């Protein structure tokens, strides 16, 4: 009885985690809770102590506060899930046929190129107005070079939140729009991972990379055994994480590495590929544990005063403009150029303009944008305001895309209803009934609507 109850509870948890709408709202709730806990007078001190509570691993250089453990450690679960899903998509999913996925793949690139341009442009305008110095809401001034280090903050799309908005407001949209967004966001994740590895990792001693390579090879063979030795797999995964950290590469990328090395084809008569199966099992931990707790600490930054001055801070405005305007601008421009100039084709039944509401949803940054804001700025105040910009910009993008998707969904619903009505009318017009009379005469009757003519 107890085992049945546990299975039922776990099945419920998995259903909640699988719902883009519910998991997205949970993460948003934790993000807002972090902002409140860090700024309410009676919780701010306790929250700060919790965030800075240090935990060290003996015989290593790893000694971090709880907030950094969440960012560098717990978030690895999310990146492992991303790695497994990427492997599945690259092998048998939407990215396995580059020709079919060409437009959304190119749109992902365009969506990552436009936001940094707008970010630097906005920062330049503020710098020109302030004689080269940029003053943030706290009153601290920074140079253009210092603030422009955050160019990568608005480049990433949060796939969970963007799909949650789609699930909430776009019930009648064709599946091709969701598939387009899924493909675009998957490539966006891959590009964000490369961006973190290249620009936000400081390479240390080479021998750590040798250790990472050994871990990768061992993982590759362990997960291909008929009976996977899970204890050994866990040890190898942890060692890969430690070596990534010691090598100066962001340790969450260990999750992506081992995820991509997991088989995505059925083996030994299995019904589903291991990459898909492992991703399904990890999804509840990623969606309901790793991401909400990360959001709690990522937005849990203390501001001396939450005033309107925050909304006109150069870095906040730059991040907001880059996410809300830059993302859809880059995606739509690339979609138009690739179809009208490059000769590529959209999915059947889709036009470029149909993608605009979904492109606006790609301006929802959150997870990876929060992470990049923490990595790009060494100054705590600047990093905090950048993350505030991500939070506000993402919420604005969510509202805009939600309104547009709702209107688009109603339009598609009306069009589908009209087509169905016309189709039914045509079928009625074509309905013919043959009646044989007693003398052998055949009378053809045609049914139109509810009237029968002979």
Swiss-Prot record:
Keyword Cell membrane present in the record's keywords: the answer is yes
Q: Where in the cell is it found?
A: Cell membrane
GO cellular component terms, A-Z: plasma membrane
**InterPro entries per the record?**
Na/H_antiporter_dom_sf (IPR023171), NhaA (IPR004670)
Q: Which residues cross the membrane?
A: 22-42, 64-84, 106-126, 150-170, 190-210, 228-248, 284-304, 306-326, 355-375, 386-406
Membrane topology is: Multi-pass membrane protein
Q: Name one GO molecular function term.
A: sodium:proton antiporter activity
* Top-rank lineage group of the source organism: Bacteria
Q: Name the Gene Ontology biological process terms.
A: regulation of pH
Q: Which family does it belong to?
A: Belongs to the NhaA Na(+)/H(+) (TC 2.A.33) antiporter family.
Protein name per UniProt? Na(+)/H(+) antiporter NhaA
Q: Which gene encodes it?
A: nhaA
